[in-house]
């Protein structure tokens, strides 16, 4: 039998209206960071997407505290994965009656927080 380690909590944000490349800049910035430090960094980040990442991180912390009873002062962000979601296709008129397609990308965010063990 495989025993699962249940000292982690996750939160997901789906269909965020930002490209995965831009979201990954913020997600890689907070990866392997303490939750308290990451919340401060996201509060003062100039990136537009930082607010949504902060809300998802708060949701993961709430899941850890309420569902699993983990200590929020010892939580670290172990995973912050970004994936592609749907692509909205739009048409932009161009010269001489032509048109080109514009792709508006959406992305998914998955944040996992783990309780740091005392060593």
From Swiss-Prot:
Superkingdom field: Bacteria
Gene Ontology CC: one annotated term: cytosolic large ribosomal subunit
Keywords: Ribonucleoprotein, Ribosomal protein, RNA-binding, rRNA-binding
GO biological process: translation
GO molecular function, one term: structural constituent of ribosome
Quaternary structure (record): Part of the 50S ribosomal subunit.
Summary of the function given for this chain in its UniProt record: This protein binds specifically to 23S rRNA; its binding is stimulated by other ribosomal proteins, e.g. L4, L17, and L20. It is important during the early stages of 50S assembly. It makes multiple contacts with different domains of the 23S rRNA in the assembled 50S subunit and ribosome.
HAMAP family: Ribosomal_uL22_B
UniProt similarity note: Belongs to the universal ribosomal protein uL22 family.
Descriptive protein name: Large ribosomal subunit protein uL22
Organism: Rickettsia typhi (strain ATCC VR-144 / Wilmington)
Name of encoding gene: rplV
């Amino acid at each position: 039998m495989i025993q699962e380690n249940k000292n982690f909590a996750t939160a997901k944000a789906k269909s965020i209206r930002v490209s995965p490349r831009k979201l990954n800049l913020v997600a890689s910035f907070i990866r392997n960071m303490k939750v308290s430090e990451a919340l401060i960094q996201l509060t003062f980040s100039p990136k537009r997407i930082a607010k949504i990442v902060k809300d998802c991180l708060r949701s993961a912390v709430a899941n850890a505290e309420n569902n699993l009873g983990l200590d929020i002062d010892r939580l670290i962000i172990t995973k912050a994965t970004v994936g592609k979601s749907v692509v909205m296709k739009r048409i932009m008129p161009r010269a001489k009656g032509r048109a080109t397609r514009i792709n508006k990308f959406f992305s998914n965010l998955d944040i996992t927080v783990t309780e740091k063990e005392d060593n």
